[in-house]
Amino acid sequence: GRFIWNDVLVALFASDVLRQHPGETIMYNLLCSKVVAETILSNHGKPFMWRTGHSFLKKKNQEVKAAFIGELSGHFFFSKDFYNHDDGLYSTLRLLRYLAETDQTMSQAVDSLPKYISSPQICVGCDDDKKVALMDKIAPVLRKDFPEAEVIDDERAGDGLRLELSKGMFVVRYSQNGPYVTVKFESKTTEGYETLRKYILELLRSYQEVDWQSDINVNVEALEK
């Protein structure tokens, strides 16, 4: 078996929803893989990215009217077909129905999507009174070091920024819920993934505000390996 990140499920659910609601908008959060937008476009839907936090997504959907909303954290909202709240059992049954109707195994469905090598969501400790200032320091460095990237740092990013690269992306943001910053990155190639991993590790190590010994750290080994 293999681990399937929740944003891959967002892409599969988007494919399913767009079969029944062609041309509709699919909303997803900042941390999701590029596979989500690419899958939406290939199924003739309209991708709409918004800041992380399911409360922010639900509020924005009062305006956007997306047919489906998905988050990396595993919140899935089938706005056109259900009651506009996330329900794990419904999502599971919905996935099983999609696989049955398209006559695919889970592996076949995942393998049909665009391929990216993606990190887990990485959380690194940073005190609440320092994390906003840390992002203010990091942002100009990223713009300088990645002049070719599309930098998303407006209201879609909310509490951080996302760099869209030709063969990957990465996100760095401060948490709204605790004393830490979040990192997520990906690339189409192993070489590109390693380049981003090493860059992000050295970037964060250059700031004393980052607490590598914090009990709140999650998946830090994905950066340090």
Kindly give the residue locations of the regions a language model identified.
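Short Gly/Thr/Asp-enriched flexible loops that form oxyanion-binding sites at enzyme active sites
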Residues: 1-10, 36-37
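Phosphate-binding and adjacent anionic-ligand microenvironments
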Residues: 19-225
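A conserved helix-loop-strand patch within extracytoplasmic ligand-binding domains
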Residues: 12-20
